[in-house]
């Protein structure tokens, strides 16, 4: 996390210095991880033609920051070399403490282990000097307005203030609004709303939920408590027909009457009676 913060602060300051009108919204964790991986492969020796492809790096940065390709290659190389030295110093600082504890736990068998604390002391002094240079670097390249943000938000770090101010393109009011709303910038930012005064804090979760429901949602509580029981459809009364063609249908008042059409004699002759003939026996 510390290495990513160093990379993000250095890139933001570099782009803001050479491209003041550039859109920094494309700089995210993906490009920071890419730069960190590229610089990790370089090592403390810095960039060279064998281990660093300037064209590929410039093309990648151009995709995230339009106009990055117009920056001179020498300026980009100096920034890469300086940032590589800062990262190597930070890595040495992280590795010194585990190595020193491991050396103290070992038993001195030969004269070689006895000389290791002196080497560690020299590495510690060199890493401390690199760390001081690293700390002095961002302070020299602070964006205008960072001191105001740090004064208003004491819990905000320098990297966070630079990130928010770069996102706001130097607009101090917009940067303050972003800090109040708690918009996260660098990966390790836990949010600035922890120790802010009540008037500068953003709305809490429950308050925000109730506000949204009150403003945008219409809830009819009386209507929700009602139980809707639809009425059963009423049956239509039977329509009784008593007369058809001026004749009484029946005394019961049925609706329909079986009306048979008269058939011709030729049609009747075609009918076949399938029932067997009835046998009559006379005694």
UniProtKB/Swiss-Prot annotation:
GO terms for biological process: negative regulation of cytokine production involved in inflammatory response; negative regulation of macrophage cytokine production. It comes from Bos taurus (Bovine). Its main location: cytoplasm. The lineage of its organism: Eukaryota, Metazoa, Chordata, Craniata, Vertebrata. Interacts with PGR and ESR1. The CUE domain mediates interaction with PGR and ESR1. Residues 141-184 form the CUE domain. It is found in: Cytoplasm; Nucleus. Belongs to the CUEDC2 family. The modification Phosphoserine is found at residue 110. GO terms for cellular component: cytosol; nuclear membrane; nucleoplasm. It comes from the Eukaryota. Residues 87-109 have a biased composition (Polar residues). The keyword Phosphoprotein applies. CDD domains: CUE_CUED2 (cd14367). Residues 115-124 have a biased composition (Basic and acidic residues). Pfam families: CUE. This is CUE domain-containing protein 2. Controls PGR and ESR1 protein levels through their targeting for ubiquitination and subsequent proteasomal degradation. PANTHER family: CUE DOMAIN CONTAINING 2, CUE DOMAIN-CONTAINING PROTEIN 2. One of its GO terms (molecular function) is ubiquitin binding. Residues 87-139 are annotated as: Disordered. Keywords: Cytoplasm, Nucleus, Phosphoprotein, Ubl conjugation pathway.
């Amino acid at each position: 996390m510390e290495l990513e913060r160093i990379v993000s602060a250095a890139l933001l300051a570099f782009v803001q210095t050479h491209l003041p009108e550039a859109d920094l919204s494309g700089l995210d964790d993906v490009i920071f991880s890419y730069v960190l991986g590229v610089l990790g492969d370089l090592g403390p020796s810095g960039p060279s033609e064998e281990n660093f492809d300037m064209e590929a790096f410039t093309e990648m940065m151009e995709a995230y920051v339009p106009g990055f390709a117009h920056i001179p290659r020498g300026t980009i190389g100096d920034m890469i070399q300086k940032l590589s030295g800062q990262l190597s110093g930070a890595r040495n600082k992280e590795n010194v403490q585990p190595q020193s504890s491991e050396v103290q736990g070992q038993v001195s068998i030969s004269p070689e282990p006895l000389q290791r604390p002196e080497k560690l002391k020299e590495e510690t002094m060199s890493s401390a000097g690199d760390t001081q240079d690293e700390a002095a670097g961002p302070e020299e390249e602070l964006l205008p307005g960072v001191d105001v943000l740090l004064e208003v938000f004491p819990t905000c770090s320098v990297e966070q203030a630079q990130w928010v101010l770069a996102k706001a393109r130097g607009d101090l009011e917009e940067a303050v609004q972003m800090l109040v709303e708690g918009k996260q910038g660098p990966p390790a930012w836990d949010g600035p709303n922890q120790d802010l005064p009540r008037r500068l804090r953003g709305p809490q979760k429950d308050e925000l939920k109730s506000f949204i429901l009150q403003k945008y949602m219409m809830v009819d509580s009386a209507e929700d408590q009602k139980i809707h029981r639809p009425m059963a459809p009423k049956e239509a009364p039977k329509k009784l027909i008593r007369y058809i063609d001026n004749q009484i249908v029946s005394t019961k008042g049925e609706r329909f009457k079986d009306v048979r059409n008269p058939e011709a004699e030729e049609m009747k002759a075609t009918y076949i009676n399938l029932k067997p003939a009835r046998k009559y026996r006379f005694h």
